[in-house]
């Protein structure tokens, strides 16, 4: 696989899509914007309010904003509700499956609980959120019926003002993709939390529970539907909270774990302990939720 060149991936710019025209192209389809959130009381409100004002009230493009609160210890749920989102606790969605953990769990449950035929996911910690992110992600799906998954990418300035791809992306995701999944090397931001897809495709994918979900979905959608069914869109510039390195090591471990798991399940154990000098050890588990298409009571797509 080392000699396999990166495949081309259709690439768009958010600015090339007009929201009024997208309303016409949308037809009878419903669009849900879902935000997984944990302890994001400072940013989730403005994000929800901006989507609601621009894409529900000014232009009727989005039908639903759903925030799945992933065990927040602050006022994330209340702030999101006041801003106009439908808010559900992760624990109240599919409780018969037990309490999972992490971002992937929240995404999986948001897919179950939402009503849209097209799903847009955005991170809830973005400080300069622009509703154009949603327009850019949904635009290719409405313009090109052959696409099933659209990944966002952006300029991401670091604390020095220079644009970077993110530390975990540059130090872990990009190298492991180049080594094990070189056909995906054209994906600019493989760990970006902004992406969209058709329910009929997403409901057939397993969801890694934790931080590995972003990369896991890229790998799995490409394997099932092919790169011709995928695209990426330039969302411009995005600023979010920069976490200290000790908070990034669990994410880096989960991303590496997911990549190795997808390459060959026998390469890793189902559970690993991240040991860091001077800090408490953290267990990182390779756990995934099943495709929703097989979950009893799930609202299936019409496809």
Q: Can you describe what each PLM-predicted range is?
A:
Residues 1-53:
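N-proximal low-complexity "stem/linker" segments adjacent to membrane-targeting elements
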Residues 1-6, 243-303:
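Terminal low-complexity segments of carbohydrate-biosynthetic enzymes
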Residues 63, 77-105, 113:
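Conserved donor nucleotide-binding strand/loop of the catalytic core
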Residues 69-78:
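A conserved acidic beta->alpha catalytic loop
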Residues 95-103, 107-109, 129-201:
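Acceptor/aglycone-binding surface of glycosyltransferases and processive sugar-polymer synthases
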Residues 119:
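Short aromatic/hydrophobic "clamp" motif used to bind/position activated sugar donors
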Residues 123-129:
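The conserved acidic donor/metal-binding loop of glycosyltransferases
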Residues 164-258:
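Conserved catalytic loops of nucleotide-sugar-dependent glycosyltransferases that act on lipid-linked
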